[in-house]
Amino acid sequence: MFFVTPAYAEEAPAAATGTDAHAAPAAGEVHTETGVAEGEHARGPFPPFDSTTYASQLLWLVITFSVFYLLMQKVIAPRIGAILDQRHTRLSQDLEEAGRLKAEADAAVQTYEGELAAARAKSNAIGAAARDAAKLKAEEDRRAVEASLSEKIKAAEVRIADIKAKAFADVGTIAEETAAAVVEQLIGGTAAQADVAAAVAAAKKEA
């Protein structure tokens, strides 16, 4: 269905009856160019502001916006919605993945801290055990040295006692011999061995 404006209706008969500008003029016809037709056409209103064309302009405006609305509703809006849904889904997946990775990282950190604490506790226990073992070994070594020294001291005391006893025995014999020699020098004769021994023994008791 076509809508014909009054301006188009006025120009249509002239275009239908007019001759081709490039055709040869008829016999006896003199062709002259004037600016009357162009002047009359130029004196008309600007087409968008021509009140006689408002109806057709409004109709085409409604048609254009209807087509644009249908295009937006059927083609552009669904595509934009699909893109937004896709981006939303992708963003949700990325957030879930980030949360999962963060949870794994937190778990790894907790595991590392637990292992580190266990290693420290084990190291402290090993150090304490080593110190205790060193103390025990030192105590055992000290006791062994003391026992060895005690045995050596006892052996030395026994030896000293033997030496004393032997020395005293030798001193008694020497004293008896000396006393016998002195008596012999004094009286010019020998004294009985029993008397000399008794005299030396009495002297030891008095000493």
From Swiss-Prot:
Q: Does the keyword Transport apply?
A: yes
**What protein family is recorded?**
Belongs to the ATPase B chain family.
Q: What domain of life?
A: Bacteria
Taxonomy of origin reads: Bacteria, Pseudomonadati, Pseudomonadota, Alphaproteobacteria, Hyphomicrobiales
Relate the assembly described in the record.
F-type ATPases have 2 components, F(1) - the catalytic core - and F(0) - the membrane proton channel. F(1) has five subunits: alpha(3), beta(3), gamma(1), delta(1), epsilon(1). F(0) has three main subunits: a(1), b(2) and c(10-14). The alpha and beta chains form an alternating ring which encloses part of the gamma chain. F(1) is attached to F(0) by a central stalk formed by the gamma and epsilon chains, while a peripheral stalk is formed by the delta and b chains.
Intracellular or extracellular location(s): Cell inner membrane
Q: What name does this protein carry? A: ATP synthase subunit b 2
Physiological role: F(1)F(0) ATP synthase produces ATP from ADP in the presence of a proton or sodium gradient. F-type ATPases consist of two structural domains, F(1) containing the extramembraneous catalytic core and F(0) containing the membrane proton channel, linked together by a central stalk and a peripheral stalk. During catalysis, ATP synthesis in the catalytic domain of F(1) is coupled via a rotary mechanism of the central stalk subunits to proton translocation.
Gene Ontology CC annotations of this record: plasma membrane; proton-transporting ATP synthase complex
Q: Name one GO molecular function term.
A: proton-transporting ATP synthase activity, rotational mechanism
Q: Which Pfam families match?
A: ATP-synt_B (PF00430)
Source organism of this protein record: Rhizobium leguminosarum bv. trifolii (strain WSM2304)
TM spans, by residue?
A: 53-72
Which CDD domains does the entry link to?
ATP-synt_Fo_b
This protein's record includes keyword Cell inner membrane: yes
**Membrane topology annotation:** Single-pass membrane protein
Among InterPro entries, the record links this protein to:
ATP_synth_b/b'su_bac/chlpt
What keywords are assigned to this protein?
ATP synthesis, Cell inner membrane, Cell membrane, CF(0), Hydrogen ion transport, Ion transport, Membrane, Transmembrane, Transmembrane helix, Transport
